[in-house]
């Protein structure tokens, strides 16, 4: 086999016909500026071709189900292995996907509980066991010889009634005696039973003495008793002791039954085991009373019931006032002072009691009717489930929240599944063990109390679970729980989960391609991640990692720097070699940062802010330990801490959602906290994340930033446009008029191919220019509208230098380092980092109030150190204008430039959730308890 992968003539996206050699069975890091072509080389060339060759090897019949992959634009690739991509874009948003299902640990847990689990009565009557006739007989024969026994069939247990038909059937079946409520009677002489009392009725099947040769008779009698009592038998030893047996998993005291233990019983994705109330989701969509009455100090007349406020109709306000008058409820009393009975009536209705409703609409229509009062909660639920209107359903949804299912307490499983425990009655059920952190889960497995027989059965299952948990622990995910919904994971977390799964597969000879696995990982955990990558390499695999993390680059066997710039200024191999060789390459920007010739400087002084702050007290959502956090305003704030320490919970779930409620009227419910102060010092909340700026190719930088509106205005003002009567809309490719109708303004036509990938070809009518020929005849400075869209931002800045309104917006795009992007580049082709910087550019050209709060969650994702340097300059501009910038970040180059740090920890999960250190980077670095401070020391020298 070849010792290297050889690529000739790669031209995907901005790659400039490059040739590159990649050593096999090595840890190879591909780096470079955002937009330089790293992903084009790793994913769109290497992975795409590896996948395509595999799919091509299958039959045409199989290919129609798998889909066909487009051949990447490359001349040849030699030495290619089967490729597996582990990126951040394939996180499951299915609410049924959890960490346990994605890693397949749940499959082994289900098997463990099915094989060595013991069900326990939910009513506290102890273990529930199932016994065969043979097992019952063997156990009875262990009693002392000459022991006298009664074999009873319990046909009625704790049921009210006279039960005459039961006695008739017993007599008809040929049995002579019965035991009723502990007393033996002849079946024909049973006294009349009280209808209102509970009774126990047992058929006396046989009376025997334990002695040699009795086994056959005992077997027949036990079998008969089980048949009569539908699986139950009582062995009365005649000296006050009774033995209860069942051939089913059923409690002999209360009758609680459990089906035969099998893996599907413990699956919340199967009807057999899922909670019947929430269908295995663990949550139910319920009306949230806090959203219905957000301010309980208001009266009903003042509008305490938000859903029934008179926005478009007076129907509900009129009905409310007349109903309250009828039922004697004061409309002018603060809602919080109403009695519980009054609140229940307002929320859930009058329980059939009617009131007279006289309604007059704005058109003069009158309605007189006696009706029960429905209640606002009942009304919202009914309208949400019965309406055919998307608008109404959306409106009703704003007053609802996903609340933990009351029936299963959020565990997703049926009572029968949750009754099964491993390790005795003190052990945990499968829901409880799934709620443990990975680290605690490992400890729990190590101290399981099993019998010798159970240990033998469980050993291979426990090994698989233990190995997978250890892999998760080793990639820095020790704080996660198996019950954590996959949709709530960050891109970095989901990628490391799949990485752990691949390590567990022990494959060799595979080409793994990873996209920034260090995202969201604290420096403390980076060493463990790198060790995991090296372990995969040592199994005989080739790892190609797109990465900007300095530690990962230094630990690589081979480093490829793509550049020198981004977009049209990138797409070349600037340097390739060992990290030491790249560090010596003067052309490589990456090399200059590795060698220390370039660096992001530590600020000479820290900002003092404006003296005001936002303070949150009693923050207790997820793992937060009832903390108080102060965010000083007018500063650059970094919230830091190990993965899972509570950073996102504090900033995103509590601070951001609370401010969004107060400032933007958002209905998302914040996490748990007691009070928040200082909100009045903020007038705008701007969340700048890395989500796409548009979900269709029609969205582009020009449309997103609003500069395209100005450009279309400019074209509409040209003499040619005025002569032809063209308005601004003529120059839009989204509406009929000026666009090419052959391609609907897309510029390309999709041709569907049978058994081959769809082919996209330039439109034959407009030749990819999006507009019809008449529109393209209008020029501004010898350029038509299509040629403007093909310009890079750098070129457009010069072209429109005398049009301040346009130039200012374009300059902000250039300032954030996106000068290489074309104005018409489809938004779907922008990376997450590029999309985030485009949002920053859009904010930059808006007029600043000096009272804005910008929140960025890990803004360095996908960014090279050079990109981070530019990003920091932009963020500094926001703060210098008097605004506040708050980032959640692990990157030490960003943290060291902050004015104020809030460090959470000390660990992740239940071991975190407290504030370890606050202050300037220098103050945090001096704090011995802070992991962040420990790593920060080296950056502040």
Task: Give the predicted meaning of each segment.
Residues 1-941:
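Conserved phosphate-binding elements of NTP-dependent enzyme cores
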